[in-house]
């Protein structure tokens, strides 16, 4: 398996500087990673750095809390795509999910997917460390019903990251036809292999150059 193509090479720290984004892109090209994942403000820079390469530009929407208005998330996603993003990782409204408003969560994901279009990969961050197993299942089913391309474990900015148990449950819930991205705390080749074994087919990590 080409593990390089599983990796979203990630830098989402709030103090990330332009030269660090350039380095991120250079490493992604060197190792032929699937994408770089950067905050929306750095999408134009990443798109310019990666022009002519196979590495995609990924960004985050409603990040990291997910508590924005749906229309704000939609506008943010559309603008990011206009600026060069090819993949969008959105954060759901966890409070609405926990309150049992699965229809709200599903509709929000659907609106963003419709807005960015079928050619843009949409990943749905469900922040598994904040959810029990029932909530993980419900979040995954909402994302699948809304037409998302992936479900993703974590923002990397909450109380925990990806776990083998959560990834396995997510894969069991969405089946083989939908992607599962493990993100948060994947820092070694052994971590990567464990997540892939559990069912992940995309890995979000800031340590891509070290773990391959």
Language-model segments: what does each one mean?
Residues 1-31, 41-63, 67-180, 188-210:
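Alpha/beta enzyme core
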Residues 38:
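Calponin-homology-like cytoskeleton-binding modules
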């Amino acid at each position: 398996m080409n593990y390089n193509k599983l990796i979203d090479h990630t830098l989402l720290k709030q103090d990330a500087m332009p030269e660090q984004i350039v380095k991120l892109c250079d490493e992604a090209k060197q190792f032929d990673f699937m994408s770089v994942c950067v905050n929306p403000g750095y999408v134009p820079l990443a798109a310019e750095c990666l022009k002519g390469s196979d590495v995609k530009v990924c960004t985050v929407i409603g990040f990291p809390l997910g508590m924005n208005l749906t229309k704000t998330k939609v506008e943010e996603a559309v603008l990011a795509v206009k600026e060069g993003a090819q993949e969008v990782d959105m954060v759901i409204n966890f409070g609405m999910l926990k309150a049992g408003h699965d229809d709200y969560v599903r509709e929000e994901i659907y609106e963003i997917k419709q807005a960015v279009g079928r050619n843009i990969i949409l990943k749905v961050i469900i922040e598994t460390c904040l959810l029990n197993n029932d909530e993980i299942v419900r979040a995954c089913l909402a994302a699948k019903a809304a037409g998302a391309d992936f479900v993703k474990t974590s923002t990397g900015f909450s109380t925990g990251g990806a776990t083998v148990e959560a990834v396995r449950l997510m894969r069991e819930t969405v089946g083989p036809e939908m992607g599962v991205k493990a993100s948060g705390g994947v820092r070694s080749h052994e971590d990567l292999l464990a997540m892939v074994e559990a069912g992940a087919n995309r890995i979000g990590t800031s340590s891509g150059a070290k773990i391959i």
